[in-house]
Amino acid sequence: MGNKLNLGLVFGGQSGEHEVSCVSAYNVLKVIDSEKYQVTTIGITKKGKWYLYAGDYEKIKDGSWEEDIMHLTGDFSFFADPIFSNIDVFFPVLHGPMGEDGTIQGVFEMLNKPYVGCGVLSSAVGMDKVFSKVMFESVGIPTGKYFYFRENDWQKDKENLADQAEKALGYPIFVKPANMGSSVGISKAHDRQELLESVELALVFDRKIILEAFVKGREIECAVLEEDGQVKASIPGEVIPSKEFYDYEAKYSDQEDSKVVIPAQIDEKAMAQIRDYAVKAFEAIEGSSLSRVDFFLTDSGDIFINEVNTLPGFTNISMYPKMWEATGIEYKDLVERIIESAKRKRVTVQL
């Protein structure tokens, strides 16, 4: 017991990806070696309340953990509670705002504790679809055409902004919250009316909106793993969505119709280029630990980066662990390597 690493696994969160986080956490918890790790599970409700949870992991998966009051402990001072001070490494299995945007990473830095995942800066940049594209372009990675604005600008002159977007991008246009993942709040607009409606939907999730030109191509993803400064890219995989695009439902509910092909059936040149771009993108945002990088591959062979996910999903159908399995690292080994690498990582802020 005394030789075990004290691991604090954080799940849930306040974002629209709360449910995905819970499923990912369940899958990670299932494979953690109890002989090596003493796990403290820390749940965050959608309202932002923090609880220590000591109940059945199945209740994390189905979201009923908040009702399991016999196994909840709350109303504690996060910084003062000895349970937190005794944690050796934090593993945030969180997605979206307040989870992979640098917010909780800053908390871990203030606690002077190592943690799984990218740091504060890289998490924030990776979460913001506009800033990340600027960084990708700076290192020569092709991006598709895009246009962005903030909510106050939209409310002042939405018709003018719509005119500019149509001229710059043409239809169809993908409308996205700038800071959200798992395709939450994303729509595909085919005309002016759909564009206006799609922006209003996206504004529910963020005050900054990015519009992207449609890229006709295959959706190729690549997993990145960093261990002690060495960055590796997995064999890429392809997503074949059952709908017009790989939306939230297709990613996490529509398992029967949406398909993934690993390795992606692409030529060696494209595969090598995608793996190279994945590493470059990861390094461009100064990433650490892990990320998943998404691309489009057109029929003419052009490659465009879509986005980087600094805390990719770990559900049973998530691409990140599946791509590493195809590359030769099993799910359980992958989780352990990520934790062990985090343990050796120096916290950037020393108090």
Question: Where are each of the predicted segments found?
Answer:
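A glycine- and small-aliphatic-rich helix-loop capping segment at beta-alpha/alpha-beta transitions
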Residues: 106-115, 191, 196, 326-327
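Phosphate-binding site of ATP-dependent enzymes
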Residues: 187-276, 297-304
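ATP-binding N-terminal substructure of ATP-dependent carboxylate-amine bond-forming enzymes
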Residues: 1-116, 120-121, 125-127, 131, ...
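ATP-dependent carboxylate activation and anion-phosphoryl transfer catalytic cores
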Residues: 2-5, 11-12, 87, 267-351
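Active-site nucleotide/adenylate-binding loops and adjacent lid/helix of ATP-dependent enzymes
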Residues: 2-11, 15-16, 23, 84, ...
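Solvent-exposed alpha-helix faces
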Residues: 26-27, 200, 279
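Hydrophobic beta-strand scaffold residues
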Residues: 39, 114-115, 143, 173, ...
